[in-house]
Structures are given as C-alpha cells and as structure tokens.
Amino acid sequence: MPASTLLQHAQIDWDDQGRPHSRQYGDVYFAINEGIAETQHVFLEQTRLRQRFANLAPHGCLVIGETGFGTGMNFFCAWQLFAETAHADARLHFVSVEKYPLGHADMARAMRLWPELAAFTEPFLRQYVAVHQGFQQFTFDQGRITLTLLIGDVLEQLPQLDARIDVWFLDGFAPAKNPDMWTPELFTQLARLSHAGTALGTFTTTGWVRRSLIEAGFTMKKVPGIGKKWEVMSGEYTGPPNAPMSAPWYARPTAPEGPREALVIGAGLAGSASAASLAARGWQVTVLERHDAAAREASGNPQGVLYLKLSAHGTALSQMILSGFGYTRRQLELLQRGQDWDACGVLQLAFDSKEAERQGRLADAFEGSLLRAVQRNEAEAIAGVGLPAGGLFYTEGGWVHPPALCKAQLQHPNIRLLAHHDVLALRKADGLWQAWAGDRLLASAPMVVLAGAADVKRFEPCAQLPLKRIRGQITRLPVTDASRALATVVCAEGYVAPPRGEEHTLGASFDFHSDDLTPTVAEHQGNLAMLDEISTDLARRLGTAALAPEQLQGRAAFRCTSPDYLPIVGPVADPAAFAEAYAVLAKDARQVPEVPCPWLEGLYVNSGHGSRGLITAPLSGELIAAWVSGEPLPLPRAVAEACHPNRFGLRRLIRGK
C-alpha cells in the first residue's frame, strides 16, 4: 500500500537563460547548452546503449530504469538513439521514478529548448495527461516504445516494481541536494532489479555512493566527464542472482514456445485491449468474436463513463483504478474528441450524508488535479443545469463511446478479427490451443487469451472462477435545445451524460436475477426516476414527463464482476494440479512450498471488469502482455497479484472450500 496518494507537482522557477530550477531541491534540471551532450555522454555512451540497441533481435526488448524523470531529457535521447539504431521490430521499455512530476505547461516549456527532439517530445506531450500517484504507463510509436512512470518517492515505488532492468540511468539531483534518495536502500533496489551485465551510468562520483554501489553488487569505475564535470561513473552489475520476488503461484510462467501467434476469444474491451498489447509486441493475433462485429455486448453502449470509484486508503483496487484511468485517458487522446469520447469531466453528487462523508475523505486524500470538492452553486455552474447538491468533480473524467475504443485497438496490422466465430471448447494438441465450435476447428495457436466476460467459465480451466453476471439497462433520450446545456457527466446512483450526437445516455440499472437482455419498460421507468434524483431541472429540459416509457430506446447487457471487484487478469493454472501442489496451505497458510506452479502453458484470462471496463480493461491488456513477454509489470507487484486468477484457488485451499 502506498504511503501517500497525495501528489505534489514540481515547483519550477525559470532563470534568465530559460533553464528550469527546482524549488524543492534548489538545483537546475540540466545545463542550458550542454544538457543533451551530457545525457549522451553519461547515460548513452557509458552504458554502450548504441551497441545494445543495434544488437537487439527482432521482437527483443531492452529495459532501461531511471531514477529521476525530471523533464524527460534522458528518455527522449534514448528514444532518439533507439529509433536510429534498433531493428524495426525491436522494442524499448523505459521505467522511470519521479517524486515531483512537472505540470504540463512547465514540461512543454522545457521541451521547447530542444527543437531537435521534437519528433519525440510532441507525441509525449500529447499524452502527458492524467499523471497521478503510482504506476503510469504510456505507449508510443504503435507500441514500439513503452514508458512506465512511477510517480512517488523512489523508496516507496521501486520496491513495488517487478522488472528485469538491462541499463540504469542513476540520475536525480546531486546527493548533496537530494540526500533522501541517495541511500543504501536505493542501491539495494537497483541490485534487486538487475541481472548479470546490467549497466549503470551516473553523474555523481561521490565516494560513499561509489562504495555503496560496489557493496550492492556493482563494479564501478570513474571515467572522464564532459564540460565542467571532470569525471562521471559507469558500472556493471556483477553481484549474485536475485531471488524471485513472489511465491510460486504468482511467479512468471515461461513464455510460450513456437510461433508468435495468439488467439483472443472475445472482442469487447478486454479482448480488444489484449489483442492490441500483444500485436504491439509482434504477435500475430486472431480475435474470435461470436457476434457480427466487435463490442456487441457490455462494451457496446453508446456512452460509458470514466468514473473513478476510489478509496482513501490506497487499496489494490484503488491503485488499479488510478493507473488504469491514466492509461485509458492517454489512449483516448488518439481518438476523435466529441464523437469517440469527451473530457467533459465527471461530477459525483453528494446525494446523502454518507456519500458526503466519503467524498470528504477522498478530497483530503487526493490532489486537486484529480478531484476536488465543489459546493452546489459551483456544481451547477460546471454542469450547466440545476442540481440538488454539490459533490466531487473529476476534472479529467468524461464519457467514451466504447465501440470506438475497441475498433481503434483492433486496427493494428497484426490483428485479424473473425466475426461469427463462437468458441464452445478449447483443446490442447501438439503444443497448440485449438478453438472448437462443435466438430469445427475455428483456429489454433500456442497462446490464447480468454476475454469473453462470464463466458470464460464455459472453458474447464476457468470453470471455478467466481464470476457473476449483473444485468444493466441504459436508456437513450433524444436531445432537446434545452438539454444541450448539460456540460459534464453527472452521477448519483446512476449517471447521465452530455449528448453524443442527438442523444443523451442515461443509466444504468442493476438486476442480479434476470438473464433476459430484452429492454424492459420498468427499467426505463427506473432510469427516468434516477434522472429525477440527479437533476429535476435536466428532466424538465428533456421533457421526460411527456415521454412514453414504452416508446423509449435502450439496450441491456451483462456486467461481469468478481467477489472482490478486482478484474481477473493473468496466466491460468491447472485447477486440479494446483490444488494438489499446494494442498499443504489447507493446514498452514504460511507455508510457501517450493513447487513450481502447474501452469497451463500459453493460457491467459482477462475478465471481471464489472462496470469499470473503460478504466481497467485497456491497462489489463498491457498486464497480459507483460506476463507473456517478461517485461516490467505495469502495476505494483501486489496489485498484479490481487488481480491474479490464482487468488481464488489459494482462498479455496486456505478456507477449506
């Protein structure tokens, strides 16, 4: 659990040469005329990065770790060198920690100092949104470049990272200016994340830093510096191999053997995201969808809401939501605003005293750039309509047309979508997973991702997953001249969105018992009653009193949720063999048997996103790809484990159920 969810941005002063100075550290971020040259000398040349990039095999990935993202200069220089020298099918994954991220305006101002890096800074700035505490992942160049920012204190963030770092950029302000970072605990983490041959470059030549790095397992040497810096240091990890980070039931499975081909079953948000993340890593992906097109079930609503139901206590679900929200928002920047999505904000009304109390705790726990409390008069000014109360305003929230996001994710040239392919059974033969419909073989591949919501339970390895279907119905309301005033999504027990085209979306009901997806008049009436609770003014503007509920248009679909409300994302084990391998846990839950997990090689699941799929599904695609490829996980290790399919098998053993 993170020590703090309260983000602090960098406090910047600009000198007469245009250089940014940190008020927190009392130091300059880079030399005005030598910054790029210094980065190239200390970090690129001393770690032999040009050679490492050139030696990358097709589909190979080099992982760089950095302390102190700052203005991003080291990242952009590394990206530029990678673009010049690496194989077209190779990848770069850059992981960087930053305690005080620059605001967008300061970041943009710094980047104007490097016009020669514009090809790299401009796409970054376009996605530099929704950067909040914790793990924040970015994707560039059609997935060829991944940036994972760990926002927070380095000694809180690095221990949560599951990664195998090839090169370290040991940056950040000088030890004298930033003593809290330069500690033995930091060097222990660098060593934990390294392997034999991991390279390291750093500006500092301070004696105790050098000695501490050597003690942690690095072989260090001083080398000639650049400009006013006489000497710098470079090194290599030569210490002992590091122990696994986790218990065997959460260990990384070996990568599937054979061709880089995968099946994804289901073309909703989870399936589309899984396909996109694998395709970006060079996999040829076949998506099998039983309907005539993607996003025909729960992902097919005309408008979904980017609403963050957070906890003030830094729970695994809250961390997942915060990381997933940022990732989705950055993906949406590539779509058509107004038609595919809109960052109009989300207003959550404090509709009773209990909700007001909950919102007060959240307003104290999170920074104002994410959410802020607003009184009724300000809430009405934001929304453009009359409201019964104030609440929390999520500035970066909004609505999304989910089919547009699915379609965009499926457009990668490595993906083919096969509609009207309803997979009824999976079989493993000759190292391949075979997808069958009766006696008809639909497709086969060494790897498969089950992404069909609750229908993943039709396949034996996932039959015991405790997934639950909850029916929900939305109502589509024709826009009026008066209702166009609604300027933000407003939520209470339900939600209403500003118009997309000529319709508002209103919803959504919760029915735990019905399996019938035919829209009902009763639920249209229930949705209209929810609208009255949200805003009688808006209901009047929409003329709902004159609308005949039986004439209203809408759609119903099943949400798919798990008992702990976290998605189920990761590799799948053989249930019977798992129970046998770890049977001792039934007697002593503290035992960690040294028994490898009986994985069903190449089988993964991505399901259970409930009503949060827009926020959790896209990042879960990256989590699936990281499990498969051995890349850094896009979430803290504890959060990835909290989403792991094996959590339920463990609970059954420990609780004796």
From Swiss-Prot:
<dbReference type="GO" id="GO:0016645">
    <property type="term" value="F:oxidoreductase activity, acting on the CH-NH group of donors"/>
</dbReference>
<dbReference type="Pfam" id="PF01266">
    <property type="entry name" value="DAO"/>
</dbReference>
<comment type="similarity">
    <text>In the N-terminal section; belongs to the methyltransferase superfamily. tRNA (mnm(5)s(2)U34)-methyltransferase family.</text>
</comment>
<dbReference type="InterPro" id="IPR006076">
    <property type="entry name" value="FAD-dep_OxRdtase"/>
</dbReference>
<dbReference type="GO" id="GO:0004808">
    <property type="term" value="F:tRNA (5-methylaminomethyl-2-thiouridylate)(34)-methyltransferase activity"/>
</dbReference>
<dbReference type="InterPro" id="IPR008471">
    <property type="entry name" value="MnmC-like_methylTransf"/>
</dbReference>
<dbReference type="InterPro" id="IPR047785">
    <property type="entry name" value="tRNA_MNMC2"/>
</dbReference>
<dbReference type="InterPro" id="IPR017610">
    <property type="entry name" value="tRNA_S-uridine_synth_MnmC_C"/>
</dbReference>
<feature type="region of interest" description="tRNA (mnm(5)s(2)U34)-methyltransferase">
    <location>
        <begin position="1"/>
        <end position="238"/>
    </location>
</feature>
<keyword id="KW-0560">Oxidoreductase</keyword>
<comment type="function">
    <text>Catalyzes the last two steps in the biosynthesis of 5-methylaminomethyl-2-thiouridine (mnm(5)s(2)U) at the wobble position (U34) in tRNA. Catalyzes the FAD-dependent demodification of cmnm(5)s(2)U34 to nm(5)s(2)U34, followed by the transfer of a methyl group from S-adenosyl-L-methionine to nm(5)s(2)U34, to form mnm(5)s(2)U34.</text>
</comment>
<comment type="similarity">
    <text>In the C-terminal section; belongs to the DAO family.</text>
</comment>
<dbReference type="InterPro" id="IPR023032">
    <property type="entry name" value="tRNA_MAMT_biosynth_bifunc_MnmC"/>
</dbReference>
<keyword id="KW-0489">Methyltransferase</keyword>
<dbReference type="InterPro" id="IPR029063">
    <property type="entry name" value="SAM-dependent_MTases_sf"/>
</dbReference>
<dbReference type="GO" id="GO:0005737">
    <property type="term" value="C:cytoplasm"/>
</dbReference>
<dbReference type="GO" id="GO:0032259">
    <property type="term" value="P:methylation"/>
</dbReference>
<protein>
    <recommendedName>
        <fullName>tRNA 5-methylaminomethyl-2-thiouridine biosynthesis bifunctional protein MnmC</fullName>
        <ecNumber>2.1.1.61</ecNumber>
        <ecNumber>1.5.-.-</ecNumber>
    </recommendedName>
</protein>
<keyword id="KW-0274">FAD</keyword>
<keyword id="KW-0819">tRNA processing</keyword>
<dbReference type="InterPro" id="IPR036188">
    <property type="entry name" value="FAD/NAD-bd_sf"/>
</dbReference>
<keyword id="KW-0808">Transferase</keyword>
<dbReference type="Pfam" id="PF05430">
    <property type="entry name" value="Methyltransf_30"/>
</dbReference>
<keyword id="KW-0949">S-adenosyl-L-methionine</keyword>
<keyword id="KW-0285">Flavoprotein</keyword>
<feature type="region of interest" description="FAD-dependent cmnm(5)s(2)U34 oxidoreductase">
    <location>
        <begin position="265"/>
        <end position="657"/>
    </location>
</feature>
<keyword id="KW-0511">Multifunctional enzyme</keyword>
<dbReference type="GO" id="GO:0002098">
    <property type="term" value="P:tRNA wobble uridine modification"/>
</dbReference>
<dbReference type="GO" id="GO:0050660">
    <property type="term" value="F:flavin adenine dinucleotide binding"/>
</dbReference>
<keyword id="KW-0963">Cytoplasm</keyword>
